[in-house]
Amino acid sequence: MRNEVIYDKNGRPDIMVVFTPSELGLPDTLRGRKVKEYAISKYQNTLIDGVPYSLPFMKPAVNISHDEAIRLCESKGEGWHLITNDEWVALGFWSWDNDTMPTGNTASGKSHSHPEQTGTTYEGGWGKTLTGSGPVQWNHDGTAYGVAEMCGN
């Protein structure tokens, strides 16, 4: 697992967490294509000029339908896609197996179960937090290198 900046067709950066298939327990094919790695957005995506990006300390995109999220992610260029159910579940099982189940923003900017864990809220966000602004306990692996915000927000 590593963090990597990957650029979309517009040349804009996304911060991604990159895994080998074996690290996630996933096959080496995705949508019928052979893959050496899975790149998963490190942060909840924000919208910039109507395009989703994985960047820290941004307002997360909200009120988007599943179909619209698929379209937006695929608009970034070849190979870009909305996280699949298999990828999401694999991250969850990884956290479970490694005893790092993430907490998150479940109580207006803080964790309900650990209120000392807080993120940065923003005006008009109704208790939502800026992407990546929470502590490492909000990441899938409990480190600064993990996928953020799998719980809450």
What is the role of each PLM region?
Residues 26-150:
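Short aromatic-cysteine micro-motif
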